[in-house]
C-alpha cells in the first residue's frame, strides 16, 4: 500500500498578515519558512504538511502580505515532492463553509494539494476546518494518522484559557488513530493520541515564556520529533529586580519584553535602563510598567482562586456561542492588543 509520506515535515498557524500586516511579522514568517525547508532537507523529508491558518485575516489579504505568501508557498513547493495545505478557519472567507479561501492560487502549483475536503491516502487522512455536521463523521475514520485543524474541548486555547465543551467534536471521536495531529490552538499540548503540535513561533504576549513552537518531523511508523526555531521571536514578562541580576539571560535581539518596576527607582533611572538595554541587546521592543500597589491588605482564608483580567476576558470570549460571531477572531484581536 502506498502511504502519504515516508517522512513528513509539519507546521501550522503561521498567520501571515498579523499585526495589521506588519512587515516585521511577515519577514519573521518568511525566515521561518526558509528555516523549515532547510531543516526538513537535513532530515530527508519528502512531504510537507501545513495544518491551517496561513493568513490571519479571513476577509481581506493585503497586497504586501500576498507577495510574502506567494514567495513562501513557492519556496516550500520547490523543496518537497508534495506539499499538503490544510485550510484553517482563518483561511476561509466564511467560517461555516469552505466555498471561498484566501489561497486559490495553490491550484496552479502541480505539487501543492489544497485539502478542501477530507483526503485519505493509504493509512493517513487530512481534514480541513470542519463545517456543519461534518464533525459527526470523524469517528468513522480508520486511518492510522490524522492531520487537521480541530477545535477540541478541554485543550488550552493559550496558556491561561481552556476550550469549553459545547457538545460537538471531542478527542473521543478519534478512537481508531495512533496519532491525531492538529493546528488551531497555538500551545503545544498532548492528551491521549491527540497532539496539538504548537504553532510556528510565538506571536504576542499571550505566548510569553512559551518557546516550544516550530516544526514537527514525523517518520512513518515512528514518533513525532519537535524542533524549535532558534531565531523565533520571544515574549517575556519579568520583574525588574529579577532581570537586573542577569539581563543577558533574558534578552537578545529577538526579544519583546515587559518589565514590571518592582524597585523604587526614578523616572530618569528607568529610562536610562531602558535605553541601555535597548542599545546593548537590540531588542524588538521594551516596555517598563509601574508595579501595581495594593491600597489595603487583607487576610484571606479558605480556598481562593485568583484570575487575572486576561484570564477573565479570554474565558468569557471562549464561552461565546454564536453562528455569526467567530470567538477565535475575538480572542486573536484581544491578544493583539497586548503587543
Map each language-model feature to its residues.
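Active-site environment of divalent metal-dependent phosphoester hydrolases
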Residues: 15-19, 56-59, 86-97, 132-134, ...
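Beta-strand-turn-beta hairpins that frame and shape the catalytic cleft
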Residues: 2-9, 119-126, 141-145, 194, ...
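Short, conserved loop/helix-junction motifs that constitute active-site signature segments
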Residues: 76-79, 139-142, 171-176, 250-252
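Divalent metal-coordination and catalytic microenvironments
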Residues: 13, 33, 48, 53, ...
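Accessory, non-catalytic peripheral segments of nucleic-acid enzymes
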Residues: 220-339
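Conserved catalytic scaffold of divalent metal-dependent phosphoesterases
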Residues: 69, 87, 91-172, 200
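Core catalytic region of metal-dependent phosphoesterases/phosphodiesterases
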Residues: 4-5, 14, 18-119, 173-177
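Conserved beta-sheet core of the metallophosphoesterase superfamily
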Residues: 159-223
Amino acid at each position: 500500500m502506498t502511504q502519504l509520506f515516508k517522512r513528513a515535515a509539519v507546521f501550522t498557524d503561521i498567520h501571515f498578515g498579523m499585526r495589521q500586516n506588519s512587515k516585521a511579522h511577515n519577514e519573521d514568517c518568511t525566515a521561518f519558512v526558509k528555516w523549515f525547508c532547510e531543516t526538513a532537507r537535513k532530515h530527508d523529508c519528502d512531504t510537507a504538511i501545513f495544518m491551517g491558518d496561513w493568513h490571519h485575516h479571513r476577509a481581506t489579504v493585503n497586497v504586501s502580505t500576498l507577495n510574502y505568501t506567494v514567495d513562501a508557498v513557492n519556496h516550500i513547493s520547490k523543496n518537497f515532492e508534495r506539499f499538503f495545505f490544510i485550510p484553517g478557519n482563518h483561511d476561509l472567507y466564511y467560517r461555516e463553509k469552505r466555498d471561498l479561501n484566501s489561497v486559490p492560487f495553490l491550484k496552479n502549483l502541480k505539487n501543492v494539494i489544497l485539502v478542501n475536503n477530507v483526503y485519505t491516502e493509504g493509512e493517513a487522512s487530512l481534514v480541513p476546518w470542519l463545517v456543519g455536521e461534518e464533525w459527526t463523521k470523524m469517528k468513522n475514520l480508520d486511518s492510522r494518522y490524522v492531520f487537521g485543524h480541530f477545535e477540541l474541548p478541554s485543550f488550552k486555547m493559550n496558556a491561561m484559557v481552556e476550550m469549553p465543551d459545547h457538545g460537538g467534536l471531542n478527542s473521543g471521536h478519534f478512537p481508531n488513530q495512533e496519532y491525531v495531529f492538529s493546528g488551531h490552538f497555538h500551545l503545544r499540548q498532548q492528551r491521549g493520541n491527540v497532539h496539538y503540535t504548537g504553532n510556528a513561533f510565538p506571536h504576542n504576549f499571550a505566548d510569553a515564556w512559551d518557546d516550544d513552537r516550530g516544526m514537527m518531523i514525523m517518520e512513518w511508523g515512528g514518533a513525532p520529533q519537535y524542533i524549535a526555531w532558534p531565531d523565533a521571536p520571544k515574549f517575556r514578562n519579568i520583574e525588574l529586580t529579577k532581570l537586573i541580576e542577569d539581563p543577558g539571560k533574558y534578552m537578545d535581539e529577538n526579544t519583546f519584553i515587559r518589565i514590571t518596576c518592582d524597585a523604587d527607582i526614578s523616572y530618569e533611572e528607568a529610562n536610562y535602563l531602558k535605553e541601555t538595554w535597548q542599545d546593548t541587546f537590540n531588542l524588538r521592543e521594551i516596555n517598563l510598567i509601574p508595579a501595581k500597589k495594593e491600597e489595603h491588605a487583607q487576610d484571606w482564608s479558605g480556598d481562593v482562586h485568583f484570575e487575572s483580567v486576561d484570564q477573565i476576558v479570554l474565558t468569557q470570549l471562549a464561552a461565546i456561542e454564536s453562528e455569526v460571531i467567530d470567538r477565535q477572531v475575538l480572542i486573536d484581536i484581544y491578544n493583539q492588543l497586548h503587543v
